[in-house]
Amino acid sequence: MEKMRRPVLIIFCLCLGWANGENQVEHSPHFLGPQQGDVASMSCTYSVSRFNNLQWYRQNTGMGPKHLLSMYSAGYEKQKGRLNATLLKNGSSLYITAVQPEDSATYFCAVD
């Protein structure tokens, strides 16, 4: 008998795509529904007048944001547990390997 895979819900993007003068940050996709064990992938793009760093955050319902990792220069790749992130000149991608039900949350990036 084939084991049924349970869907895992990950809500991505506070949809903050905030803008401040010339600075903009946009997220995609707005919603993910990967299966348990899959790789979830999300990205943010940005257009800023000055870049210092990019941070990825996770926020569970009813809780404050939790910092996941920081990245400082284009071409940078960082791994932390099941999280893997890449930083390009105008964007970043976050990957969660072996997705689990407890990964369900809102994920977003912020640029400083």
Swiss-Prot record:
What exactly does this protein do? V region of the variable domain of T cell receptor (TR) alpha chain that participates in the antigen recognition. Alpha-beta T cell receptors are antigen specific receptors which are essential to the immune response and are present on the cell surface of T lymphocytes. Recognize peptide-major histocompatibility (MH) (pMH) complexes that are displayed by antigen presenting cells (APC), a prerequisite for efficient T cell adaptive immunity against pathogens.
Pfam families membership: V-set
Query: Which protein, by its recorded name, is this?
Result: T cell receptor alpha variable 7
Q: Which PANTHER family match?
A: IG-LIKE DOMAIN-CONTAINING PROTEIN, T CELL RECEPTOR ALPHA VARIABLE 39
Gene that encodes it = TRAV7
Q: Which residues form the signal peptide?
A: 1-21
The record's subcellular location field reads: Cell membrane
Report the Gene3D superfamilies cross-referenced here: Immunoglobulins
- Glycosylation (residues): N84, N90
Q: Which parts of the sequence belong to the Ig-like domain? A: 22-112
Q: What Gene Ontology cellular-component terms does the record carry?
A: T cell receptor complex
* Major localisation: membrane
Instruction: Name a biological process GO annotation.
Output: response to bacterium
How does the annotation summarize its subunit structure?
Alpha-beta TR is a heterodimer composed of an alpha and beta chain; disulfide-linked. The alpha-beta TR is associated with the transmembrane signaling CD3 coreceptor proteins to form the TR-CD3 (TcR or TCR). The assembly of alpha-beta TR heterodimers with CD3 occurs in the endoplasmic reticulum where a single alpha-beta TR heterodimer associates with one CD3D-CD3E heterodimer, one CD3G-CD3E heterodimer and one CD247 homodimer forming a stable octameric structure. CD3D-CD3E and CD3G-CD3E heterodimers preferentially associate with TR alpha and TR beta chains, respectively.
Keywords (alphabetical) are: Adaptive immunity, Cell membrane, Disulfide bond, Glycoprotein, Immunity, Immunoglobulin domain, Membrane, Receptor, Signal, T cell receptor
Keyword Disulfide bond attached: yes
